[in-house]
Amino acid sequence: MLWKACRKEFNKPKYLAHSSDLIYKYRNEIAEKARFRLVDKENGDPLRVVEHIGCHYSKMFPSKGVGGAEYPYVLAGMAEAWGGNVIDYPERRHCCGYGFRQYHVKANRGYSIANTHKKFESMEPYKPDMIITNCPGCPYFLDRWQYVIAEMEGKTYGQNGFGIPVLTYEELAGLVLGYDPWDLG
């Protein structure tokens, strides 16, 4: 198919790693240098973290992802090393709603928000303090649709009425290391 489209071939490299695999590899070193841990400053309890693995992380090359395609551990491993309590929830592997066919085709946008709605309904009983992702598109859609759902249905997820914070693993690593949130972007 690639050859038909652009006369190019994809030669799978011998070594293949997602950038989140690299942070995972150094998660313990980051924990040693951490200025902050993923704990509630009021009571010292671990923060409740739900993870969202981007659809393309382990589905494209199932044997390459940390933990495999069925139960990827790359984000959970980071959150646990940094003091968090990773919460499993029924729709953990469900799409965030971004899929190119779901969002970029205007007629499919209802499907996009329905995906995200299903995911939030699934995680809500577990009262997560944050969501961590490893895809640049997922946090955008998890944030965007969370607030659209609030406007449409008057329902806000999260304990404080402001929604559940959504962070990428890079942002979370930076915060744990003590970087200023405004400098992280």
Residue positions per predicted region:
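Iron-sulfur cluster-binding electron-transfer modules in prokaryotic oxidoreductases
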Residues: 1-185
